[in-house]
């Protein structure tokens, strides 16, 4: 008897919640869908090796060089930041900025180092909650017209130990 009463009470409590649940908004969906567009980029290129990414640098130096190229590219109206073929670049977190297309060319490897100090605290979300956390490998905040392209390899640097 008590089990049956409990079930009826739970049903009575849950019914209003179902009625109040947010329904699918087809108009909102269409509005979001229509706002999506192909990013636009200026026809300029920035080769990361021209900004200090030498083939024998540390992860911190590669990170600074890559970020310098990204920052300059965005500041000058956007374009393509190129990670050149034939090299492996060990780096820390990279923050994309508006107007930047990060192209990892075929034969290039962009590998993220397991060095926590190379991943600054950034504003992010986790399971829908706004929070501050260590930066992901590639991060962008309030940026428009960004992309990662190319046939190269992006290696998150994960292992059985991380």
Describe the residue ranges of each PLM region.
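Extracellular "leader-to-stem" segments immediately downstream of a signal peptide or signal-anchor
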Residues: 2-7, 12, 19-101, 105-162
